[in-house]
Amino acid sequence: MKIAIDAMGGDHAPKAVVLGAMKAIKEYSDLHITLVGKEEEIRQYLTNEERITILHTDEKIEATDEPVRAVRRKKQASMVLAAQQVKEGKADACISAGSTGALMAAGLFVVGRMEGIERPALSPTMPTVGGEGFVMLDVGANVDAKPIHLYQYALMGSVYAEKVRGIKNPRVGLLNVGTEDGKGNDLSKQVFSMLKDAPIHFVGNVESRDLLQGVADVVVCDGFTGNVALKSLEGTALALFSMLKEQLMSSFTSKLAAAVLKPKLMTLKDKMDYSEYGGAALFGLKAPVIKAHGSSNDQSIFSAIRQTREMVAKEVIPTISSVMEKEPLR
């Protein structure tokens, strides 16, 4: 199995990418990794070249670049070359912690959209109180959506939850302003009607306040709603931990309590860190394309590689393609 990784993408590249890749190579004997980026910088951290090759390029896509224009003009950028490896059959999948917009553009223009899929979806796995996590799609690939798009998201998310996350008959929920039938705007009502007859385990409408309680294994929404929900969850978690830290450091007594509670608090923090689940998969493409978090450390990169490997090994893309072929046009 071969995975191409944009070694220059992310806040801590290339160090985090290289260290994460070496960790993955040590863990999985069937894995070969191509690191795409500046060879001199990559070699500063590469201490084990077993099953790791370097594809050198001096060019990379910056966070300030306009995504689509950058992908079209910077043909030798590390992210574009990683996607090109997939297109040419030299890699089974690719990963980048770089610009989300640019990776989506590279996925569409270089890797290509799967036949039958109208719009791709960006889908992270989010944490839950019980530790199971849930898949949410879309969180920003398309801010405007049609009913057919969300219908296809539900099918793709269900396949992923079952194949990669090992959930039998995963529960699929539609993110809405209430749980009752008939709630929401015209888009929500149309999608609800379609999902009731879909070949999935549809559990109806779900509210954002219940997401972390694990109300569904797959949560479907348009990209605008999903992005707002995602960032609200992120911001709330960060604010709560910040407030808790402030209170625990406010007095000598509370500092003693903090010392006692530290292991439990760290466990809780890790449990709520969605980067531990891997990256956000870009569903609807001809091959797995994974967006790792921009602030990924080596463990986060390793998690993204593990996730990508599972997608390839469990044949997620061929399964989604097969499901879509059986679905009538709506």
Swiss-Prot record:
Coiled coil: none annotated. It is found in: Cytoplasm. It catalyses: a fatty acyl-[ACP] + phosphate = an acyl phosphate + holo-[ACP]. Gene3D superfamilies: Isopropylmalate Dehydrogenase (3.40.718.10). Catalyzes the reversible formation of acyl-phosphate (acyl-PO(4)) from acyl-[acyl-carrier-protein] (acyl-ACP). This enzyme utilizes acyl-ACP as fatty acyl donor, but not acyl-CoA. NCBIfam families: plsX. This is Phosphate acyltransferase.
